[in-house]
From Swiss-Prot:
Lineage: Eukaryota, Viridiplantae, Streptophyta, Embryophyta, Tracheophyta
Gene: petG
Predominant subcellular localization, coarse grouping: plastid
Signal peptide, first to last residue: none
Subunit structure: The 4 large subunits of the cytochrome b6-f complex are cytochrome b6, subunit IV (17 kDa polypeptide, PetD), cytochrome f and the Rieske protein, while the 4 small subunits are PetG, PetL, PetM and PetN. The complex functions as a dimer.
Organism domain of life: Eukaryota
Its job: Component of the cytochrome b6-f complex, which mediates electron transfer between photosystem II (PSII) and photosystem I (PSI), cyclic electron flow around PSI, and state transitions. PetG is required for either the stability or assembly of the cytochrome b6-f complex.
Any one Gene Ontology molecular-function term assigned to this protein's record: electron transporter, transferring electrons within cytochrome b6/f complex of photosystem II activity
Annotated localization: Plastid, Chloroplast thylakoid membrane
Species of origin: Amborella trichopoda
SUPFAM superfamilies from the UniProt entry: PetG subunit of the cytochrome b6f complex (SSF103446)
Protein's UniProt name: Cytochrome b6-f complex subunit 5
Length: 37
């Protein structure tokens, strides 16, 4: 039997992690743009 609770936690963390990485990369990109100007 599949452990539903940990599986749900993992499925919930994956999009949050991806979103966090995307936001961090975007902020660093914006910050780099401002420094170049």
């Amino acid at each position: 039997m599949i452990e539903v609770f940990p599986f749900g936690i993992v499925l919930g963390l994956i999009p949050i992690t991806l979103a966090g990485l995307f936001v961090t990369a975007y902020l660093q990109y914006r910050r780099g743009d401002q420094l170049d100007l």
